[in-house]
Amino acid sequence: MRELLRTGRATIELVQGDCLEVLPTLPEGSIDVVVTSPPYNLGIDYASYDDRQSREQYLEWTRRWTKAVARVLAPKGSFFLNVAGKPSDPWGPLEVAQVCRESFTLQNTIYWVKSIAVEVDEATLSVGHYKPINSRRYLNDCVELVLHLTHEGKVELDRLAIGVEYADKSNVTRWRSAGADRHCRGNAWFVPYSTIQSRDKDRPHPASYPPALAAQAIRLHGVERAQRTLDPFSGIGSTALACAELGVDHLGIELDALYHAEAVRRVRGVTSPSLFARR
């Protein structure tokens, strides 16, 4: 099943199917940016996919789809791969990274911070969302990895597109790189989930990421250079939503019919720019 949607300046193509069958049909080097989050093999209850493979099976499957992505990624393209483990099995993301090393260069390691507690003026400020862990051995898991993979590690980025203002404004005139009061955000990205009332109604997927995370990755690569983007594990369309509102053409591939239908519904609901899409 294939849906072709127009949202403002973007053409969003959503395909229901197996990415290992769809990716070989794409021209070589035809994708500028890939943003995705595959199943982590943590035993999550997806509607269709079996998330309980042996480690060997899972890594071999990872090898197959990452090589397929490498073929379609443009020479100066960026591949942002969100991957996570669990406290009792922390090696999973590192083993996935080693598989990716067969086809890509790791250019940047980004830490997606979902929740954080910081000391501010002698008070503790806790913001974001986390799932409490009932354990005396493990800490609550508040961070996931986003691996920025490229062919040769030489892709130039639009770092100030996601830059932040200087807290000390004297730096604006002190540093030549200060520009229009912006400096590099760095590789720790605080992107919390939006508050929802009902998982089944508002976010009917067991392992989605916020559209804002995908938007930030695409803006870092450079919106002007992102002619076509890809998410081979589209889920309920987080990357598609980001692309719709950034005005970037996108192809999303999703195995499950229910998640695919929800992605189509969500993209059709895009009518105006959101905060995460603003330059």
Positions of the model-derived regions?
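Short, conserved SAM-binding/catalytic segment
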Residues: 1-9, 264-278
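Short, flexible loop/turn segments with low-complexity composition
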Residues: 159-163, 274-279
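Core catalytic lobe of class I
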Residues: 2-262
